[in-house]
Amino acid sequence: MGEKTYGQKRESTKHKRSAKKREKFECENAYPVSVRKDLSVKVSAIVEQNRVACSYDVETETDYFDVNGIISHNCRTRVVANVHGQPTTEGRGNLSFTTINLPRLAIESEGNAIVFMDKVKSVADDVIQQLLERFEVQARRKVYNYPFLMGQGVWRDSENLHEDDEVREVIKHGTLTLGFIGLAEAMVALFGKHHGQDKNVASYAYDVVKSLRKVCDDATEKYQLNFSLIATPAEGLSGRFTRMDRKKFGIIQGVTDREFYTNSMHVPVYFPISIWKKIDIEAPYHELCNGGHISYVELDGDVSKNPEAFEAVIKYMADAGIGYGAVNVPVDFDPVCGYTGVIGDTCPRCGRKDGEKVSAERIHELRKKYHR
């Protein structure tokens, strides 16, 4: 198994490979820093299972916990710090979040980095005010408006409320989150390169996200509410923002010429880069994005045949400071019997060999046998 270089054209596979069907091995931090060097991630279970969870430590949680067991970000959203009590995850949640379209601000800045930074800070301040307005709307609601969360005592301290009470004193434990998308495309619009291509651009990009975190921290102190910065996942928003900006500004090479903006602070998936460098570039943002973050890498091959390589990637993520990491591996698909998983020269389900001709009768037999 070798590492995948992003942007390279993948060689043809022996069996039909579905790009949409990928197993994700999501690895959450679960060990204190003191034992990081002794961490050994065992992945032998991959042989029997298509999915396996593993745990490792990074520095993003240890300020709040004597970490023991698996700590979940709930797939990007992270609720930890609390200005109104203990920094726990139970009985709390994210109240709302708003995402800033960084590429649009960069296009409007016409290559001026100073103007762009001012725009980012100004829009971020607007987002804080918007989140405050949302909070006020939610805070004036009554317990009976939330029969499950409040009426059943799911939300922290809600068991002390009566049916007609406002929920303000309860939802203040929640988070109000500012997010961002398209850092890579924003840098291309400003400098002609993104943060995966140039160290100076990477330094500026980091300062941009750092300024967003400062806006959140300042708002937390000023309003005594839990404002946080999230590396927005934006699976749907990434395409919507791009379509809107292409309609307004036209096709801009490296910015609006694709069907999507790159999620948050990620290096573009189409850019050729080693997994190690990708981790190094994205890791510093995890500490800034205290409202949630994730980084992906992809391995091209059967991880069950080389668990040491898989383990090396996980350890590298841990040492780099990745707070939430995912390792994707391609999944093969046999169109005859419908088997999904790792396929070598022979399908483990029906025994069909690579390139073997199959009669129509045999196909019908296999599909009937496996209920396809």
Model-derived segments and spans:
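A glycine-rich phosphate-binding loop feature that marks nucleotide/adenosyl-phosphate handling sites
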Residues: 8-12, 18-28, 140-165, 209, ...
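Flexible loop/turn segments at secondary-structure boundaries
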Residues: 53, 64-67, 105-110, 192-194, ...
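Short secondary-structure subsegments characteristic of cysteine-rich extracellular domains
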Residues: 62-74, 196-216
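Structured mid-domain segments that build the active-site/substrate or prosthetic-cofactor binding neighborhood
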Residues: 75-181, 185-189, 194, 301, ...
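Conserved structured core elements
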Residues: 37-40, 52, 94, 114-117, ...
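Aromatic/basic-lined ligand-recognition segments
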Residues: 78-84, 249-282
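Extended amphipathic alpha-helical segments with heptad-repeat/coiled-coil character used for oligomerization
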Residues: 217-265
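Autoprocessing domains of the Hint superfamily
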Residues: 1-74, 267-372
